[in-house]
A protein has these predicted regions:
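Ferredoxin-like alpha/beta domains used as RNA- or RNAP-binding modules
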Residues: 1-198, 221, 228, 241-265
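Short, well-ordered loop/turn sites that connect or cap secondary structure elements
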Residues: 209-210, 229
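Short secondary-structure transition/capping segments
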Residues: 216, 227-230
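Short strand-turn-strand beta-turns centered on an Asx-Gly dipeptide
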Residues: 217-219, 238
Length: 265
């Protein structure tokens, strides 16, 4: 199947179509030239779209790895591997570099401050990976194509002065993930029922939210309230955050299902 038909099959439109076309180009480059080839940074939803597209193209998951610069990264590149490369060596060919932007602790800078500053310098989102903000510094994963420019030219976030230096990605400061555990019983594992617990809202409101297209199940849009959620699945909604269904218990005597969700703050 040619590229255009593959993109049509996956329903790719607009910016998503352009992005996914580049993913196929990188896969082709690695295969035909037998060299490592990486995409730009992709969001979790874009990674899911890309995985579906590559599956439709007959490209196995063993042909590429997801890598964001550190274990557990949310934004990641897809690095396509040539035949001669062992996946364990892929980090050597990673296009990801890390900048540490230090600031005075009392300034209380946020993720939004750093992202806004970078985009104000003309750096597009796909060149920027995770931004890990600590009390007095932020570690920013970027592509090698912009790393040197930023190391030399990035001086402030808003009115706050920054001291920027490149560090080894293996030295990133990973903030502790803030999560809240919630336990409940539900009548079924339908998406609307589980969202009612995860987002603390009435089931009818959860169903309406799903039908509006604002909810994603494992980073894929889920517009059907009756879709089944399985243990280990991640559910997210614009404006409401995300949660993971971490445990499904045995049916109670009253016919309800105990569940545990981890809500990310």
């Amino acid at each position: 199947m040619d590229k255009s038909k593959l993109l049509d099959q996956c329903g790719a439109l607009g910016e998503d179509r352009t992005l996914l076309a580049r993913v196929l180009d990188r896969a082709k480059q690695a295969s035909e030239r037998n060299i490592p080839a990486a995409t730009d940074f992709l969001s979790p939803a874009q990674q899911a779209q890309a995985a579906d597209l590559l599956h439709a193209a007959g490209i196995p998951e063993t042909a590429y790895i997801r890598w964001g610069g550190y274990d557990g990264a949310e934004r990641a590149v897809l690095l396509f591997l040539p035949d001669w490369m062992d996946p364990s060596d892929a980090g050597t060919y990673s296009p990801i570099r890390c900048l540490r932007a230090a600031f005075r602790k009392e300034e209380n800078l946020t993720h939004r401050d750093f992202l806004g500053s970078l985009m104000g310098m003309g750096i597009v989102r796909e060149k920027i990976g995770d931004i890990l903000v600590g009390p007095d510094s932020a570690d920013v994963l970027v592509l090698d194509t912009v790393a040197e420019f930023l190391a030399q030219s990035w001086e402030s976030a808003g009115r706050v002065k920054l001291r920027v230096a490149e560090i080894d990605p293996g030295c990133v400061h990973i903030p502790e993930i803030r999560r809240e555990e919630r336990r409940d019983t539900v009548s079924s594992l339908r998406l609307d029922a589980v969202c009612s617990t995860g987002f603390r809202m009435a089931r009818g409101k959860a169903a309406a939210l799903i039908e509006s297209g604002r909810v994603q199940l494992n980073w894929r849009e889920g517009t059907k309230p009756d879709r089944t959620v399985s243990e280990g699945d991640t559910v997210s909604a614009r404006g409401f955050g995300k949660f993971e269904l971490t445990e499904v218990g045995a049916l109670t005597k009253k016919g309800r299902i105990p569940i545990t969700v981890q809500c990310y703050k």
